[in-house]
Amino acid sequence: MSKQQYNLNTKTDYLNRKMFLDPAGPVTVQRFEEVKYNKLVKYEQEARGFFWVPEEISLTKDAQDFKDASDTVKHIFTANLLRQTALDSLQGRGPAQVFTPVISIPELEALMYNWSFFETNIHSRSYSHIIRNIYNVPKDVFNTIHD
């Protein structure tokens, strides 16, 4: 059984829809010329304004500090990064997977996908960036994430 994502022939008045579980179904065409909740648009715009790329940050000093750290500090630091990677992989995907099928307005859908993007991509990429810069073979470190 396949589930139809949306029907382009369905005209939707998002200004009169519930935020979740509207009888008309999920968001079809994302239209933002008029929105029901301007505050959600502002939150989403603000979140996009915080966009950054981990590779923009130099970790030269951090890599040296890590080399000079004790084995205990290295273990705690690395274990934390691995757990943060696992956590953000889950918490970024989970809410989007659960809520987007029942979201009924485009401004909330956009905010949810933005949040998911930051959690799964920016945060996890940041941890990878750190590990790549402090370990010679980052793959060996990431391969221990399930240990």
Task: Specify the residue positions occupied by each region the protein language model found.
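Non-heme di-metal
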Residues: 2-147
